[in-house]
C-alpha cells in the first residue's frame, strides 16, 4: 500500500495550516542539535551541495546556508516555503526552493553530498519509506551522507489509531488526521537501508530516531 494523492494532500493541508501562524511555527524554528553537530563532518568531507528534504519553515536549510553550503530545499507546503523564502531574503541567505514530495524528487542522479530529512519520510507505509530511501539513494553522490529521522516501534504512539498496513497507523487527531505514520525497529531499518553503510543510529525517546547513513 502506498499513500494516495488524497492522503498526501490532507497532510500538506495540515502543514499549511500549521505554518500559517507564528504559534504553529514556534516549535520548529531552532535547528536540532544533531544537525548542528554534523556540520564539522560535512566541512571535513568538503561537502558542497546539500538537500533539505521536507524543509518545513527552513530551520535546517537556513542553518546550512549560513555555513556556506549550496542548499536546495523541498517541501509540499507552500505556506512553509513562503516562510523560508521570506526568512532567507531577510537574512541574505541563498536557498533554492522547490515544491514537491519525497516520493519523486525533481533532481538528477548523484547530485548531492548530503541529504537531510527530518520528521518526513515516515509519513506513509513502510513501502513508502523504502521508496523514499530509494529516491534519496538516487540523488546522493557516491559516499554522500544521509541524515534522517524515522519513528521507532518504541514510540509511545506505536499501535495507537487505525492500522492500515504493517506497523502503520493513522491517528485521528486534528493535526494528524489522514496522516499515516509508519514505525520500524532497528532490524527493519537496516533492511530498508540496503546499500547504505550505517554510520550511527541514535534513539530519542521524546522525539524520534535519528540516523546517519553513507551511500
Model-derived segments and spans:
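A short glycine-rich, Lys/Arg-flanked "PGG" loop and its adjoining helix->strand segment in the class I
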Residues: 130-142
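A short beta-strand submotif of the Rossmann-like class I SAM-dependent methyltransferase core
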Residues: 117-120
Amino acid at each position: 500500500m502506498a499513500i494516495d494523492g488524497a492522503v498526501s494532500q490532507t497532510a500538506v493541508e495540515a502543514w499549511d495550516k500549521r505554518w500559517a501562524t507564528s504559534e504553529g511555527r514556534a516549535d520548529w524554528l531552532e535547528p536540532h542539535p544533531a544537525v548542528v553537530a554534523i556540520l564539522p563532518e560535512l566541512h571535513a568531507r568538503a561537502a558542497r551541495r546539500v538537500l533539505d528534504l521536507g524543509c518545513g519553515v527552513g530551520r535546517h536549510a537556513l542553518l546550512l546556508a549560513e555555513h556556506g553550503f549550496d542548499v536546495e530545499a523541498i517541501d509540499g507546503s507552500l505556506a512553509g516555503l513562503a516562510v523560508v523564502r521570506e526568512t532567507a531574503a531577510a537574512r541574505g541567505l541563498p536557498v533554492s526552493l522547490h515544491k514537491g514530495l519525497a516520493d519523486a524528487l525533481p533532481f538528477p542522479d548523484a547530485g548531492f553530498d548530503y541529504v537531510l530529512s527530518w520528521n518526513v519520510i515516515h509519513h506513509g507505509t513502510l513501502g513508502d519509506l523504502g521508496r523514499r530511501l530509494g529516491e534519496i539513494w538516487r540523488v546522493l553522490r557516491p559516499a554522500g551522507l544521509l541524515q534522517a529521522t524515522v519513528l521507532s516501534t518504541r514510540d509511545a504512539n506505536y499501535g495507537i489509531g487505525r492500522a492500515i498496513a504493517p506497523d502503520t497507523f493513522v491517528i485521528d487527531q486534528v493535526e494528524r488526521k489522514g496522516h499515516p505514520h509508519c514505525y520500524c525497529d532497528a532490524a527493519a531499518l537496516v533492511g530498508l537501508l540496503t546499500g547504505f553503510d550505517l554510520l550511527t543510529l541514535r534513539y530519542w525517546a521524546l522525539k524520534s530516531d535519528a540516523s546517519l547513513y553513507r551511500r
